[in-house]
């Protein structure tokens, strides 16, 4: 993807700096860094406690839920987190079930949640985008695009800029 870097398999910021040939003391120049932590040992390595924003992203398959809760249970300090759900149903009962299995985690859940529908048409477009290393909206459901815009606006706090960028993506610019 143009102007987007992916760093997969790193265990801390210094590993990423070494890979990029940066001195350990150098600061990253990225506007945003999204870090997927699926291992509780990485909570401290990537210092989630001082992150500006934290998200818990999951589907409702039992394995994904339990593995995610396993990581959350290892938090040593309270952390504010927003839920991002990928689900077909998007019901309150799913959220209630998740809250039940996450009882005891040191999390202050953000009131807002973002739901992404899991529709076959969206999955097909996502796979095609990955294969082509491009970001295209054509073929994505309106619900998916809306969720993507909401999440992006939450991350960067600039709704006008996000709307403009989404219009450009829609036009293929």
Model-identified regions with their sequence ranges:
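NTP-binding/hydrolysis catalytic cores, primarily Walker-type P-loop NTPases
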Residues: 128-173
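Conserved beta-strand segments of the P-loop GTPase G domain that flank and frequently precede/overlap
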Residues: 9, 33-37, 54-60, 82-89
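P-loop/Walker-type NTP enzyme "switch/lid" segment
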Residues: 1-32, 41, 123-130
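Conserved beta-strand scaffold positions in the cores of enzyme catalytic domains, especially
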Residues: 3-9, 54, 83, 111-116
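Inter-motif core of Ras-like GTPase G domains
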Residues: 28, 40-62
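Flexible, charged surface loops at secondary-structure boundaries
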Residues: 22-31, 46-50, 76-80, 108-110
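Conserved C-terminal guanine-recognition region of P-loop GTPase G domains, centered on the G4
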Residues: 67-78
């Amino acid at each position: 993807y143009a102007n987007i870097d992916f760093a997969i398999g790193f265990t801390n910021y210094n590993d990423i700096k070494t890979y990029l040939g940066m001195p350990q003391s150098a600061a990253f120049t990225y506007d945003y860094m999204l870090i997927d932590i699926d291992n509780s040992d990485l909570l401290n390595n990537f210092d989630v406690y001082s992150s500006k924003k934290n998200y818990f992203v999951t589907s409702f398959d039992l394995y994904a839920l339990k593995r995610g809760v396993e990581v959350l249970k290892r938090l040593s300090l309270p952390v504010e987190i927003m839920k991002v759900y990928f689900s077909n149903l998007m019901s309150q009962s799913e959220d209630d079930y998740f809250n039940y299995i996450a009882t005891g985690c040191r999390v202050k859940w953000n009131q807002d949640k973002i739901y992404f529908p899991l529709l076959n048409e969206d999955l097909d477009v996502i796979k095609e985008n990955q294969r082509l290393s491009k970001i295209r909206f054509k073929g994505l459901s309106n619900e998916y695009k809306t969720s993507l815009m909401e999440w992006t606006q939450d991350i960067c706090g600039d709704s006008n800029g996000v709307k403009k960028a989404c219009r450009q993506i829609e036009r293929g610019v």
